[in-house]
Regions:
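Class I S-adenosyl-L-methionine
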Residues: 1-192
Length: 192
């Protein structure tokens, strides 16, 4: 049993006003359903808020995704949930973070340290690698990162290839977020 507003956030669907980061993260790991509303008068003394009973069932097997990256992507997307993803990923703070992570990724890839760490960090790795290889993207090299607008165009190209640049976070379903993360990872853009 939860406070009604919190319970409604857990069970919200895309395009509803209460759809938020909490909803997306909860649905990644479980199925959530609203069972019943509990009125104020069922308690003594009556509280000032309504309550609801919610069923949360864990998914078996759980989705294979790097939770640190997942949280980073969802956090960025819901920083302003009604802005388009294109506008969110054009912000300087967002681009600074992604460019720093991209440089680190390229350096790890060049040193060969990435192969051993990615399979252990992903919790199995092979499923993630299959998803990433299904979205081939021409990657930028370290020399290409000298021009800031080039990296910005690269990020926006990843969004446009998946038709995400004009979409809003509050309208994306769970599968859309998983596809977006897979597209960014295939392009070498990470959210750690």
């Amino acid at each position: 049993m939860f406070q009604r507003e919190f319970a409604m956030r857990l069970v919200a669907k895309p395009c509803e006003s209460l759809y938020c980061r909490l909803t997306v993260n909860t649905r990644l790991l479980s199925r959530v359903s609203h069972l019943l509303k509990v009125g104020k008068n069922n308690f003594k003394p009556p509280p000032k808020v309504e309550s609801s009973v919610v069923r949360i069932e864990p998914r078996h097997p759980p989705v294979q995704v790097n939770f640190t990256e997942w949280d980073g992507l969802v956090r960025l997307c819901f920083s302003r949930k009604n802005k388009t993803l294109g506008a969110i990923f054009k912000q300087n703070a967002c681009l600074d973070l992604l460019e720093k992570n991209y440089r680190t990724f390229l350096q790890l890839e060049a040193s060969g340290a990435l192969q051993s760490s990615s399979s252990s960090a992903a919790g199995g790795g092979s499923a993630d690698m299959d998803i990433e290889s299904s979205f081939p993207v021409k990657r930028l090299g370290i020399s290409d990162l000298a021009n800031r607008s080039r990296f910005k165009d690269y990020v926006l190209e990843v969004l446009k290839d998946g038709n995400f640049s004009d979409r809003r976070s509050s309208k994306l379903a769970q599968e859309d977020f998983l596809e977006l993360l897979a597209r960014f990872n295939a392009a070498g853009i990470h959210f750690k």
